Amino acid sequence: FVIETHLRILDSDLIKVLKQAGLKAVKVGVESFDADVLKASGRFSVSKDQQLEKIRELENNNIQVSAMYILGFPTDNEETINNTINYSKKLNTTYAQFSVWTPYPGTPVFNEYKDKIIVNNYDEFDQYNLVYKHNLFNKEHIRKYLSKAYSSYYLRINWLFKYFKSFITS
């Protein structure tokens, strides 16, 4: 089975119990490299050292890790986005998912940003389109960052080696 959780919840004992119960993969929200970006968005994270330690512990227990990252937070800039992309490669999880920060209708964040919403079609609220007026980026900028994130992550020799190794051993 697969779970989606926050790294702060996982400890060695829980990882062992989940592994014994048949856990094969974990999805975790790393979201951003930048603690200030996370804090400004009302999010939190464990330290970078703890992230790396817990991810390696999962992998050492033959549990695949998918890390999820968000680009285009309201306080993101070119440096914070590039740092997040580079950090994803440092963590080198089995999979990485990159998405665009999206204030969903019906949420408090949507109400906070309703005057900045730039699309009328709710089909575009898909985490791959910038749906609000960002102070620095437009839709094309964010799409380029998403493309850069995916291509620079999945076209690395470190990731290809890890993927084929896990494919062969599974």
PLM segments and residue spans:
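Glutamate identity and glutamate-enriched acidic tracts
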Residues: 4, 31, 53, 57-59, ...
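Conserved strand-to-helix beginnings and helix N-cap segments that scaffold or border functional pockets
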Residues: 12-15, 77-82
